[in-house]
Amino acid sequence: MMRIALFLLTNLAVMVVFGLVLSLTGIQSSSVQGLMIMALLFGFGGSFVSLLMSKWMALRSVGGEVIEQPRNERERWLVNTVATQARQAGIAMPQVAIYHAPDINAFATGARRDASLVAVSTGLLQNMSPDEAEAVIAHEISHIANGDMVTMTLIQGVVNTFVIFISRILAQLAAGFMGGNRDEGEESNGNPLIYFAVATVLELVFGILASIITMWFSRHREFHADAGSAKLVGREKMIAALQRLKTSYEPQEATSMMALCINGKSKSLSELFMTHPPLDKRIEALRTGEYLK
């Protein structure tokens, strides 16, 4: 279902835009306390914008279509399955959507537990057995029931705040050092062009490094969503679903969507930057019951 995904690209863009606003409004000349307040507002602002727009952005990204009225037996089964599991998990009925993609995948998103969305690919409906598909849907329902999207928003907000604040403090120091002379007693932050250039570069660099934190949480929540699915439909069904994912096409969803999907891309320079744990680790965690306690 959920997490850091729209977040990485969306928040990166939001922070750069907010960075420009900060520079144009002269916030670099403000006190440390003022800068922290602005960093908090803009840091959490980017996350909450992403959260509030998450359903619209996710559907637009994959070209998904919300099922208003089931048109065939497959759609009817999907809606009924989501409704049954939502009742079991104690959440309101999510919107249900289908999107065209050959890979086996699904995601859930939404600003609140009671205003969420579950979407599945046509590849999942065509290539998974009913038991396997039930397990994947239960995984997404668990993401919603666990409140992962809101938690991710708070984590991303904190990360954004520190990225903005530290980047601009260091940019002030750099601009003051390279900005030339100033009269005694005159307050100056140096060359504003240097300030903005340094702040932007540092935000990008620190943003990439900070993504390690959000990626870790994304992987951690996947284990808990797998465990939630096992509790809803049974451990063996979830294990079978993960084993089926190992034979799936490479996910076709955009990179910014990967953290929302059950089947993340398997290739990565390092597991530190993966949104999902390797499938073998997820299967092993279910077999040992590590997250089922």
From Swiss-Prot:
Binds 1 zinc ion per subunit. Zn(2+) binds at H139, H143, E222. It comes from the Bacteria. One of its GO terms (cellular component) is membrane. Undergoes self-cleavage. This may not be physiological. Induction: By temperature upshift (by the sigma-32 heat shock transcription factor). Also under control of CpxR. Gene3D superfamilies: Metalloproteases ('zincins'), catalytic domain (3.30.2010.10). Keywords: Autocatalytic cleavage, Cell inner membrane, Cell membrane, Hydrolase, Membrane, Metal-binding, Metalloprotease, Protease, Stress response, Transmembrane, Transmembrane helix, Zinc. It is an enzyme of class 3 (hydrolase). Pfam families: Peptidase_M48 (PF01435). It is found in: Cell inner membrane. GO terms for biological process: proteolysis; response to temperature stimulus. Its cofactor is Zn(2+). Changing N105D: Does not complement a double ftsH/htpX disruption mutant. Residues 1-3, 55-293 are cytoplasmic. InterPro entries: HtpX_protease (IPR050083), Pept_M48_protease_HtpX (IPR022919), Peptidase_M48 (IPR001915). Disruption phenotype: No visible phenotype, however one of HtpX or FtsH is essential for cell viability. Residues 25-33 are periplasmic. One of its GO terms (molecular function) is zinc ion binding. Its EC number is 3.4.24.-. The active site is at E140. It is a multi-pass membrane protein. The chain crosses the membrane at residues 4-24, 34-54. Belongs to the peptidase M48B family. This is Protease HtpX. It comes from Escherichia coli (strain K12). The gene is htpX.
